[in-house]
A protein has these predicted regions:
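Charge-rich amphipathic alpha-helical interaction elements
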Residues: 11-158
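Short, Lys/Arg-enriched N-terminal segments with co-localized hydrophobic residues
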Residues: 2-14
Length: 158
């Protein structure tokens, strides 16, 4: 379990956060119109950079979803009173009074541990959305630069 937590910590540490992604894009979005050829050459490098970030956040989003499902199952057992003393101690929880089956959803929706797990999932999904938008812009940049080069040739009489 300790190794799992260490790997998880390292994975989170090396992953870019949303603010970093936006800062990267602020810098990478600038184009030097005086040298469109160089800008065309940069597109695959930028694509690789953002594809790597996208992949990390997609995996993290899925992992957060699975963590949520596992946590939800544990909390259902906890709130329904089906956990034994060993399981309670393993999680550091106090015994919970039995709750009616119809009330369990209310407890699950208000559970801070589960909410944190959902927040993490939503955060990674937002990062995925931002990076997908950046990737679409990079696709468009390719065509924009080619059109710009063609226009410059036309104006120059070539």
């Amino acid at each position: 379990m300790l190794l799992y937590r260490f790997k998880h910590y390292i994975f989170e540490y090396i992953m870019e956060n949303l603010e970093q992604i936006l800062q990267y894009w602020e810098k990478d979005a600038e184009m030097d119109q005086t040298e469109p050829g160089k800008e065309l050459i940069k597109i695959p490098t930028l694509h690789n950079k953002y594809l790597s970030i996208l992949t990390k956040h997609k995996i993290a989003s899925k992992k957060a979803h699975f963590d949520y499902l596992r946590g939800r199952k544990l909390k259902i057992e906890y709130y329904s009173g089906r956990m034994n003393q060993e399981e309670l101690q393993a999680h550091g929880w106090e015994p919970f009074q039995f709750v009616l089956k119809s009330d369990i959803n209310a407890y699950l929706e208000g559970d801070t541990d589960l909410i944190k797990m959902l927040e993490k999932k939503v955060y990674h999904e937002e990062c995925v959305s931002v990076v997908e938008s950046i990737m679409n812009e990079l696709k468009n940049r390719n065509w924009e630069l080619k059109s710009f080069i063609d226009w410059e040739r036309f104006i120059g009489g070539q």
